[in-house]
From Swiss-Prot:
Family membership: Belongs to the asfivirus helicase A859L family.
Lineage top rank: taxon: Viruses
Protein name: Probable helicase A859L
GO molecular function: ATP binding; DNA binding; helicase activity; hydrolase activity
Residue ranges annotated for the Helicase ATP-binding domain, each copy included: 178-349
Amino acid sequence: MCAGFYVAVHPWLETQSLHKVGHTGNLAARLHDGSYTTCFTDEWRYCFTLETPTKKDAQKIEAGVLYCAQFFRVKNKELLCLLPEKIKQLAEDVANCLNISYTLCDAPTYEMNDSTIVVEPSSPSDPLISKEKLRHLVITPVEDEDRFADDVLFFSTGETRTTIEDRLYQREAANMGYQELQRSGRAILQMACRCGKTRVAYLILSNYLQGKVLYLVPGLSLLRQTLEKLYLYGISLKNVMLVGSDQTRIVLNHDTIEMTTNPVIIVKRIQEASSLLVIATYQSSTLLVDDFDLIISDECHRICGEWETRPFTHVLLNFKKGHRLFLTATPRYDTPLSMKNRELFGGVAFRYYLREGIEAGYVNDFELQMVAAPKLAHQLSNREETTKQIIVKQIIMALAYLKTNVRSPKMLVFTRDIKQAKELYAELVDLGVYALIAHSTLPRQVILKTFTEFCSSKEPVILLNCRLFQEGVEVPELNAVFFAAPRHSPRDIIQSICRPLNKQVQKPHATIFLPLEVNTENVCLDKFSSIIPFADALASEDPRFYEHLLNPSEVAYPINWIGAHGSVAELLQLARHAIRYGTQGKIDRLTRSERLPWKAAFAELKRTVEICCRYPKINDGFHFGGATLRFDTWYKWVIKSYLQYKNNEPSSLEPYQVLDLESLQDWTTRGVGGPYPWEESMAFLETWLAQNKGELVAIDIHQGGWIGLDATPMERLSGVLTTVSQRDGRSYGKNRKLRPKKGFMIPPQQAKDLDRIFGKHNLKWRKDRDNGFLKEDEHGNYTGEPTCIQEAYQTFKEYVKTNPEYIEKYWPGYAKGKHKHQELPHIWESGLAPPRYKAFKDGNKRLIQRSPKKKDVKN
């Protein structure tokens, strides 16, 4: 007799996607027991069994499975509303967690004879098991919806199989990813959906094929498609092993290959091979051993979640060898185990925005349509019923809009949960709308049939689902998505938006529908709160949308309103205001430095360095999206974040951004240190005084030194001493405004440097004071003895007239006026310098273009 845990199915139960779980001391006799044959026909069969050494071990597995699948259990029955594959994976995880040895048998048959029939003694239904050990294996409804999509309907969202020629950005991504792997051992490639991450992964893993490579994917369908693409790119199946639970043979041209979950075969081949490519699902990763030179984690945001060992985190948390490459379109940062963890994930080595893919022609464009609530629907008494009816009417309005632009539109509707999907489906069908529904509690065959019907329909059709089709599913003819419930996760939002964006010849732009409860002219900003997370997520992927929010009059964006009862223009303005300033309407959320689109801001920084031959000044402005921004604020944030990154501290910058900065001329010296580096200037001052018998000679402290990258040491010293002279007499510290004209507004260490250097030559550099305050007349003019810095400036003014050779040597180009404007003359004349940022007393902020015709004067 053979004891074991089993999952059995009967045709009557299978129609409802129900499966019987249990344990027995005699697998050969169990399905012939009276409890099975009395109420059912004799059509029982095993889906699979886990043969165990003892019946008690099998009982523990059953108890563990029922505990972990409690949300999918029929009350007081050993029936689970889960796919057999899910129960199998769960049972194996439970057995491994409880250290129970087992033999997995798929669809087994056992010989039955008279001696097999044994009456089994009853046993406690709930044996002692450590639920704390199994807590991380508990399946929640949301998690199961995700995993179901992984294994059943995970379709490719990358390039088509005929696209083999590398795109420019793919080569760039591969180069930057490989460089970061060599530098730190970890790299993230964040690339928009449908932009060919698999091709980039192939270009990188080609450098590791002499060793062992592991390619992890979140589902069996994606495993097969990844294999097909890599085979198309030139990978030989000779050195490929597939680790997954699908026993179907895969045929590629004349080559064939099969998956395996046999741990003996897997471990032996990995350990004995000198070169090997293993493609495995995350769910099967516990069968692998830590012996890889490169590990690629596709759709790596799925790894994130609770900080605990589970199939998706097994390799990340337990494997120590090899480089790690992570691929995703939507990083996840809102979980305990998140991609902010640089030690585990590294940083983003390459970033490719959704808008870039659209403009390059690889991704279909889209429009936003906000759908207003029906005018009188809010007057009903039942709030829950009202919301349901509002959404139904908004869905019908959206479908009607699509019919005017598309011949046979197809629209995905994402609901809050399965309950809402069922309710909306019933309402729509009653109203005669052609609607379909799919969710994880339906049998697999029903879901596939529904999906096929949706894809092949020649009539306008709606498909309601919760999360089943949110990620990875490709419907070539899909025209629109409708959010029937607010989404707060940027990952969920972007993945859902990308569903209809696959590029096809003559396919019209897609439509994203956002329903809002705005039904009167007295609109409250709180009504727009549901779209703020959506707008934040989209703005991070689409710089054009970000620019539009800053100034819609200058940057157009395809956004409109359906069913508005008031002025559409006013409603859109209110929506933009709520997105930018929040529902309280107070703080500008968009102009924070970290939210400024990197590529646009860095392009302006690079232009300033390369064309103007300098780094930004305090009063430089930036014109972006029609908004007036102070560029120096962003620039200071960049420097701070860069220093944090280099000091291995938490930083807002990613590796690709650091590489951008370090590609600029003199970034680590002039970019970070500024045009007037203190230590460098003090060293020059000390040498100068020693060589010139303690005489400062001539220094310009009126305009300060030239700030260009080609500035001479004397020009940089002029800038430093200009600052010293201006700050003498001002307080240092947070309360300096309360102590005017007293103290010194410079760090104490720098004051010590000046005392030491000037003190060697008995030079006075501080201004005179009376009881701690500067000596001044009633008009504020300094009346004390001049300092050596002031005396050097008087000499400088004389030299400008009498000693042009000296001026040209230490201040080259001074006579041409570059000192006055701190710009190269030809840059000034052509108007290529950054505009000046100025905030006026009336609250307005303007950019004043620097040019000879418009002098830089107060307005």
